[in-house]
Swiss-Prot record:
Keywords, sorted A to Z: Ribonucleoprotein, Ribosomal protein, RNA-binding, rRNA-binding
GO molecular function terms noted in the UniProt entry: rRNA binding; structural constituent of ribosome
Single GO biological process annotation from the record: translation
Role of this protein: Binds 16S rRNA, required for the assembly of 30S particles and may also be responsible for determining the conformation of the 16S rRNA at the A site.
One cellular component term from this protein's GO annotations in UniProt: cytoplasm
Self-association and partners: Part of the 30S ribosomal subunit. Contacts proteins S3 and S10.
PROSITE patterns for the chain: RIBOSOMAL_S14 (PS00527)
KW Amino-acid biosynthesis (keyword) present: no
Name of the featured protein: Small ribosomal subunit protein uS14
Cited InterPro entries: Ribosomal_uS14, Ribosomal_uS14_bac/plastid, Ribosomal_uS14_CS
Length: 101
């Protein structure tokens, strides 16, 4: 079980990403545009660097919704492999069952 502070930190990061997503996208478009002048590009780079570090989507970590476990996360279900197996064995995941061949 992950510490509650880690879960809270990830929730805060998710909020920051959502809050600054539009601004980051606009600045990145200016930076990557070939028609932008060097001065405008440099200003956009400085503004992008001034944004909060945690507002970058790359800093988010996928975590299990039940335990907060960061490894063995299955995106399709939002659970770690351990909790997914437990839920499957209880029959709580429709269409999913233990393989047998």
């Amino acid at each position: 079980m992950a510490k509650s502070s880690m879960k809270a930190r990830e929730a805060k990061r998710a909020q920051l990403v959502a809050k600054f997503a539009e601004k980051r996208a606009a600045l990145k478009a200016i930076i990557s545009s070939p028609t932008t002048s060097d001065d405008d590009r440099w200003d956009a780079v400085l503004k992008l660097q001034a944004l909060p570090r945690d507002s970058s989507a790359a800093r988010q970590r996928n975590r299990c919704s039940q335990t907060g476990r960061p490894h063995g996360f299955l995106r399709k279900f939002g659970l770690s492999r351990i909790k997914l197996r437990e839920a499957t064995m209880r029959g709580e995941v429709p269409g999913l069952r233990k393989a047998s061949w």
